[in-house]
Amino acid sequence: MSRAFIIDPTISAIDGLYDLLGIGIPNQGGILYSSLEYFEKALEELAAAFPGDGWLGSAADKYAGKNRNHVNFFQELADLDRQLISLIHDQANAVQTTRDILEGAKKGLEFVRPVAVDLTYIPVVGHALSAAFQAPFCAGAMAVVGGALAYLVVKTLINATQLLKLLAKLAELVAAAIADIISDVADIIKGILGEVWEFITNALNGLKELWDKLTGWVTGLFSRGWSNLESFFAGVPGLTGATSGLSQVTGLFGAAGLSASSGLAHADSLASSASLPALAGIGGGSGFGGLPSLAQVHAASTRQALRPRADGPVGAAAEQVGGQSQLVSAQGSQGMGGPVGMGGMHPSSGASKGTTTKKYSEGAAAGTEDAERAPVEADAGGGQKVLVRNVV
């Protein structure tokens, strides 16, 4: 058993509490000075980035407002950093103070320990006197240690509360910064989407305008070509009515639906026999200019049929053939303006008529007046043959 049977356990208890306060020198917050310097430098740069007198207007005001928000954000971060440094420094000082108090109490007990040991050597009453001596010193030392620990606990609670406040403020700043960033990103995305939509709208409008111009150009080109075609047919005598049916083709481009009879409504006008004689004017004397019209041929045949048959059957046939030859020759001369052309032939003379009459009065075609004559083929001119069969 140790002679300092009260002081030694007390010193051991103080050593244990001292070990709970940590090993080494407490950090005074110097690790946060680097971040504080960064914030201060950022504040200086932001302060220098404000627009000067040479930049005015809404853009400058908007930029200045954004820059001011950044300055306020970094300023609040710097203040939080300073408060956190102060809090850490205060807590480190509290721990160091407690350590110093415990160290002093331990040293005080170690100082009186030899006296307590010497008192134990007194006969009979030595241990009692030593115990009476050690007890007050140990009690006083433990009271001081308890006070130091209480101070440390209270200081730690205060600093912990302040730390929670700082963390709440930091979270608020970060949330505001994130909201600002998200707002900026949302504005950027909104602007990009607006520009993309405007580009698509302009592109569609441009395509519509291009389509309208293209269809207008094609329609105008077709209209001009059709007008030129109508002008060409209008300048040709006898074909002015031929374009009435073809003009229906334009309805294929302007009508909502197609009709099978829209373009064929006037097709009969092209095949009409009344319009065929008008073709004599095509080419000014070439082509069909020498041929008589159907109406003229019909009128000539009618007049020939009404003539008296004084010369007999053969004479009538010959006279009919001669009349038709004269009619064809006359029509050819009138259509061509003279002997030029396919139908331009001289009128047959009286001598040729007499010769033809004599030709059919003699030979195999001849017969008695009361008898039935055989069929006679007579050349009407122009390669036409007339078969005459008369019964008296």
Curated annotation (Swiss-Prot):
This is ESX-1 secretion-associated protein EspA. It is found in: Secreted. Residues 302-392 are annotated as: Disordered. Residues 334-344 have a biased composition (Gly residues). Homodimer; disulfide-linked. The gene is espA. GO terms for cellular component: extracellular region. The lineage of its organism: Bacteria, Bacillati, Actinomycetota, Actinomycetes, Mycobacteriales. The keyword Disulfide bond applies. InterPro entries: ESX-1_EspA/EspE-like. Keywords: Disulfide bond, Secreted, Virulence. Required for secretion of EsxA (ESAT-6) and EsxB (CFP-10) and for virulence. Coiled coil: none annotated.
